[in-house]
């Protein structure tokens, strides 16, 4: 699955995207609000990157550590809350009820699966460990966004501190 879209104020490129992927096996989701989608994606990905850095890329070290995995969720929720409170949409729409129990259970299951199988290496640690500069910049930009919008993000900050030497 690939999510593609446009930034605010840009002309729609939905038809072009459909033409490009026509006849392929890709499932394409067109998102007309990529700015908010990418903000939300970053708020979900960064806590997972913190976990990768805490474990030097071996997420299996967190297998069974439900307390830590719940902190990842708490940081994600802090990020989503800051994004929502700044007037942005929570995307994908399935995440809109991010403070609900269903969201928490679904994400916790996903994080547990990532830490118990090679899915974590494939979905998170390979990228995080090979894109430290990118993750560092993303983290800096998100913290700047949080600060500019008066958001509290103590769990995020604690996880960041535990990430150790990786983030610059």
Residue ranges and their predicted role:
Residues 73, 77-168:
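NAD(P)-dependent Rossmann-like dehydrogenase/reductase catalytic/cofactor-binding core
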């Amino acid at each position: 699955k690939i999510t593609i879209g446009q930034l605010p104020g840009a002309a729609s490129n939905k038809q072009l995207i459909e033409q490009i992927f026509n006849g392929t096996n890709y499932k394409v989701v067109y998102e007309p609000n990529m700015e908010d989608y990418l903000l939300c994606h970053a708020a979900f990905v960064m806590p997972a990157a913190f976990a990768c850095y805490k474990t030097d890329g071996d997420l299996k070290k967190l297998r069974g550590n439900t307390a830590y995995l719940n902190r990842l969720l708490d940081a994600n929720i802090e990020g989503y809350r800051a994004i929502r409170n700044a007037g942005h949409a929570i995307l994908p729409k399935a995440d809109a009820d991010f403070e609900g129990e269903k969201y928490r259970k679904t994400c916790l299951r996903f994080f547990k699966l990532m830490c118990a199988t090679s899915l974590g290496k494939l979905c998170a640690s390979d990228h995080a460990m090979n894109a430290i500069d990118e993750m560092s910049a993303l983290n800096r930009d998100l913290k700047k966004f949080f600060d500019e919008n008066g958001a509290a993000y103590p769990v995020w900050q604690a996880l960041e501190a535990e990430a150790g030497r990786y983030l610059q």
